[in-house]
Amino acid sequence: MDSEFFQPVYPRHYGECLSPTSTPSFFSTHMYTILIAIVVLVIIIIVLIYLFSSRKKKAAAAIEEEDIQFINPYQDQQWAEVTPQPGTSKPAGATTASAGKPVTGRPATNRPATNKPVTDNPVTDRLVMATGGPAAAPAAASAHPTEPYTTVTTQNTASQTMSAIENLRQRNTYTHKDLENSL
């Protein structure tokens, strides 16, 4: 008998089906997606670090050059004409009739103390808006015509605030907490 006749006949692809094939790994199929995600995350982190460092530098420079106006609406006004009322305390920066310079050491401006509200000051502008706008200012002024400024002693006095501000000015680095505490 011929041996070719008894040879088993297999389909052509049958051998390929029997050979073991490995499924590709997750990393090999998604390699480019993972690499792009890593690059994007690194870029985002670099941008955030740059933004926060520049904000910190700007805040430190602003405090150093006194571009930030600290909340003290009395610091630019002369207090020579104002007599102290009994039972009230004067804010930091106020002078007595005999003193020529404010307590803070800043030179006094030529702006006299009047019943007119201070303009171009964001703190007093917000206070005027909160108390009823410009119409409320004349009513408040007519209620106490002889007392242009009345101060109330609170737990956080102006002298404590000024000492905190002076401490901040003497330091080289500042944090958000420092800026919040100074205001």
From Swiss-Prot:
It is found in: Virion membrane; Host cytoplasm, Host cytoskeleton; Host endoplasmic reticulum membrane. GO terms for biological process: microtubule-dependent intracellular transport of viral material towards nucleus; symbiont entry into host cell. It comes from the Viruses. Residues 81-157 are annotated as: Disordered. The keyword Transmembrane applies. Residues 149-161 are annotated as: Interaction with host DYNLL1. It is a single-pass membrane protein. Interacts with the host light chain cytoplasmic dynein DYNLL1; this interaction is critical for intracellular microtubule-dependent virus transport toward viral factories. Belongs to the asfivirus envelope protein p54 family. It comes from African swine fever virus (isolate Pig/Portugal/Lis 60/1960) (ASFV). This is Inner membrane protein p54. Pfam families: ASFV_J13L. Coiled coil: none annotated. Residues 111-122 have a biased composition (Polar residues). Residues 130-143 have a biased composition (Low complexity). GO terms for cellular component: host cell; host cell endoplasmic reticulum membrane; host cytoskeleton; membrane; viral envelope; virion membrane. The chain crosses the membrane at residues 32-52. Keywords: Apoptosis, Cytoplasmic inwards viral transport, Host cytoplasm, Host cytoskeleton, Host endoplasmic reticulum, Host membrane, Host-virus interaction, Late protein, Membrane, Microtubular inwards viral transport, Transmembrane, Transmembrane helix, Viral envelope protein, Virion, Virus entry into host cell. Inner envelope protein involved, through its interaction with host dynein, in the intracellular microtubule-dependent transport of viral capsid toward viral factories. Seems to induce caspase-3 activation and apoptosis. Plays a role in virion morphogenesis by recruiting and transforming the host ER membranes into the precursors of the viral envelope. Involved in virus attachment to the host cell. InterPro entries: ASFV_p54. Induction: Expressed in the late phase of the viral replicative cycle.
